[in-house]
Every structure is written in C-alpha cells, then in structure tokens.
C-alpha cells in the first residue's frame, strides 16, 4: 500500500518535469487515486490563492446600509429641528436606488438652525471592528448671504447630555452642497462631554450659528458611518475558510469537467476519438497538477500587492483596482503566471492527445490550441 501511494505521488509530480514519461504510465494504467490527489492539491492551492487575494481587498461597510436616514423622517430613527423637518425631493445629492431625498429644515428670522437625528440603533465607532468614518452631504442658505460665525457637529452617546463634538464652521458655502468625511474614534480629535463612549453613538446633530438674525435653511443627505472590512473578516475566519473551500472545490471540479469535455469535442471535430470519456477525465485530470504550482506562485506574487479599499459601486471598484493594481509589477507578474499556467495545461493536453492517439505533434498541438481558444471564449461569458 505504501509503495502504491509513493508510486502515485511520483507519477503526479513527474507530470511537472517529465510529462511524456509520466503520461505514458498514466495512460497505460489510469488510476483514480492519482487524479483525486491532484484535485485535492489543486483545491488546497486555490484556497490559499483566494485567501491571499481576498485579504488584499477591503469592502465598504455602511451603517445604515442604504441612504435610509435621509429618506424618511421617522422609521428606525427620528429627525427633529428648531424648524420643521421635511423631505426635499427636488434638492438632494445621493440619487441612488434606495431613494432620492434630502432632509431639510427652515427657520425665519433666527440666528441659528439645527437638525438632529436620534433614536437609531447604537453605532460602534471603537476598535478595529468599529466604524471609523462619518460621511454626509450638507447644504445651507442664509438669505442675508452671510457666513456662520460657528458650526458644530455632535455625536450623542446614550443621551443628549453625553456627546462628542467637532467644528464644522467652514465646511460649506451658502447654497452649495459639500461632501464631507470626518474621522471618528478614540484616536481622533473630538471634544468629549460627560464621558461619551465611542462604542455607543445614538444620535447626530448639525448646528450652525450666525451673528445676526436671518431666514435660514439647512439640508442633509447621504448620512452614514463607514468602515472597510475584508470578506474574511466580515464572515469570520471559520466561515470564510469553509466558503473558500466549497468555492474552490466547485471551481476546480467545473474547470476539470469543462476542459475535458472541450478536448473530447474538439478532438472529434478533428477526427480523433479519445476513447471512453471517464478514462480521459482521469488522464487529463493529471494535467491539472500544474495548477497547484502556478496558483501558489501567483498567490506568492499577489501577497505583495497593496491593500485596496473598495467602494460599494462596482464601476468605482474597477476604477480603484485599475489605478492601484494594474500598474503594480506584482499584479502583472501574478496575472502573467496564471495565464502561463493555462498555456502549460494546454501543452500537457497536447501530450495526452499525442500519446493516446499516436497522432502527429502538430495535430495534437492544434487540437489543444483550439480547445484553449474555445475555453477562452467561454470564460468571457461564464468565467
């Protein structure tokens, strides 16, 4: 038994450095144990690759997940003001599938205007897993066309007597929308009152003050907390590894089956019968041993890529990846290795066709090349 295992192991690794000799043995005596071992190695290497690849990407995570805070005055939150809060469907900034409103309030002949949202689920802005940014659009108008003398943003913690405070006096100009991102958390410079806790943020207040009375309006849109997390962190390590394992097993099995089917069909078109399909599946499966090698090498190259923070919008994700990764040598090398590996499998398949049918090397290479072309086209549609 031990000798048989060693023999199987020697044959599958021999595919890498002496493919003609290895496939002669495999064709003479196809062994299911060998191809299963190959597939296990490929699955393991694919899990490693996917782990490295996913650990280099952080995805935007929001609270709330949509634009819900500025699409209704009361839901899982409440808007209040020194004026009358309302939804403005004509002047807003987000304009996404979740809604197209801003929250607005106006006062007459006053020196200040404030808007605050409270009674939402507690937001954690502390530690590595907490949210570390607050984003919002804000717009104000003063009919006297004067600038505010002061502006503050408060983050309430449990009650309105306990809060963090930041200055927002210079964030915007009259009648113009300003997109603002404020860093939040214990390592940021916020004034704290009454033992406010970053783990428990329960309300937000915008307040602008002028020296003289005037008719004032304030509007807020796109209000949410944000951080960036990797898919692995989001799922949890155990769940993420299980997902990667299942995903890798499915991907490897589908690639194996699809490639074998393409080779069989293309060979028939060229007048070559490769015999029983189940036998060919076992033989051609040994060629995937190279996948375990080039996948690990590519994972090593990708391990030096910079971590990228990706927004929710898919088009913006592609733009970020193109800007951060495409010019990177590690990405170029890693991608080139992946394609070189596909060509390597094609070359090994040509060896299999040549040995099984005793056809010319030219015809075997042509069949394998056409199969590669078919697989390439299919990848454009099904991945």
Regions found by a protein language model. Name each.
Residues 1-17, 235-239:
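Short, membrane-interfacial amphipathic segments enriched in basic
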Residues 205-214:
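Short beta-strand-plus-loop segments that form exposed binding edges in beta-rich domains
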């Amino acid at each position: 038994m031990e000798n048989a295992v060693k023999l199987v192991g020697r044959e599958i690794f021999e595919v890498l450095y002496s493919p003609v000799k290895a496939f002669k043995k495999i064709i003479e005596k196809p062994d299911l144990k060998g191809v299963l071992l190959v597939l296990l190695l490929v699955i393991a290497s694919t899990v490693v690759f996917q782990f490295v690849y996913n650990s280099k990407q952080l995805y935007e995570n929001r609270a709330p997940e949509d634009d819900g805070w500025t699409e209704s005055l009361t839901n899982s939150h409440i808007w209040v003001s020194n004026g009358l809060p309302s939804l403005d469907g004509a002047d807003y900034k987000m304009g996404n599938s979740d809604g197209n409103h801003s929250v607005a309030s106006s006062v007459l002949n006053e020196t200040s205007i404030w808007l605050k949202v409270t009674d939402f689920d507690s937001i954690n802005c502390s530690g590595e897993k907490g949210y570390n940014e607050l984003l919002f659009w804000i717009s104000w108008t003063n009919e006297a066309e004067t600038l505010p003398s002061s502006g503050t943003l408060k983050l309430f913690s449990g009650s309105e007597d306990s809060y963090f405070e930041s200055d927002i006096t210079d964030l915007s100009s009259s009648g113009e929308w300003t997109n603002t991102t404020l860093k939040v958390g214990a390592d940021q410079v916020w004034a704290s009152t009454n033992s406010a806790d970053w783990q428990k943020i329960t309300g937000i207040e915008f307040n602008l003050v002028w020296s003289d009375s005037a008719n004032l309006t304030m509007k807020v849109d796109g209000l949410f907390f944000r951080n960036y997390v990797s898919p692995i962190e989001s799922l949890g390590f155990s769940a993420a590894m299980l997902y990667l394992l299942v995903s890798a097993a499915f991907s490897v099995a589908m690639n194996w089956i699809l490639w074998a089917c393409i080779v069989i069909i293309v060979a028939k078109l060229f007048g070559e019968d490769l015999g029983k399909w189940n036998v060919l599946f076992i033989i051609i499966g040994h060629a995937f041993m190279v996948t375990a090698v080039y996948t690990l090498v590519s994972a090593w190259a990708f391990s030096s890529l910079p971590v990228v923070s990706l927004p929710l919008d898919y088009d913006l994700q592609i733009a970020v990846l193109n800007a951060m990764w495409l010019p990177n040598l590690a990405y170029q090398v890693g991608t080139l290795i992946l394609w070189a590996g596909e060509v390597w499998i094609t070359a090994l398949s040509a060896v299999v066709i040549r040995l099984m049918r005793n056809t010319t090397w030219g015809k075997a290479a042509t069949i394998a090349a056409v199969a590669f072309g078919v697989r390439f086209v299919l990848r454009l549609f099904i991945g």
